[in-house]
Amino acid sequence: SPVWDTGLAMHAVLEANSEPDKTIMEKAANWLVERQILDVIGDWGANAHGVRPGGWAFQYWNDYYPDVDDTAVVVMALHRSDPDRYSEAIARGAEWIIGMQSGNGGWGAFDVDNEHHFLQHIPFADHGALLDPPTADVSARCLSMMAQMGHGPDNQAVARAIGYLKRGQEVNGSWYGSWG
């Protein structure tokens, strides 16, 4: 996905390079800002009542299905690039991500509290894609975004995310994700 790849590459360059080419970073940031979804409430709105749109989608022309994973990467890239210049996009993206946090403190990729496991027993559900439960990888990316923005454990969303990740750690010390 150009959105994911651009956000990830931009953030990596900014993290690793103390003097990146400002023209290149500005061009990438502006391209990302143009793709922020600010006016479409997709299926995610059914479980996220009152949350304003503000995310980014993995694919082009997929305004009804933005995802928190891409959004977190883009917000981190914009924040690292120029937090003042891109403050509106950053704030709206972070607001949307916080609004998409599930009751257990984690984040799914596209939805809130989409854990109706009985749906997995429907015969046409053999591929297991009817649910979008919170996962460690997506939740960790959202937590990283919030930490980069200066939110610590005293922030309610951060505390809930830390709790979710602690509860989800495997006995062997690892975490299991779904997307990355």
Question: Across the structure, where does each feature detected by a protein language model lie?
Answer:
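Preference for long, amphipathic alpha-helical scaffolds in soluble/luminal domains
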Residues: S1-G180
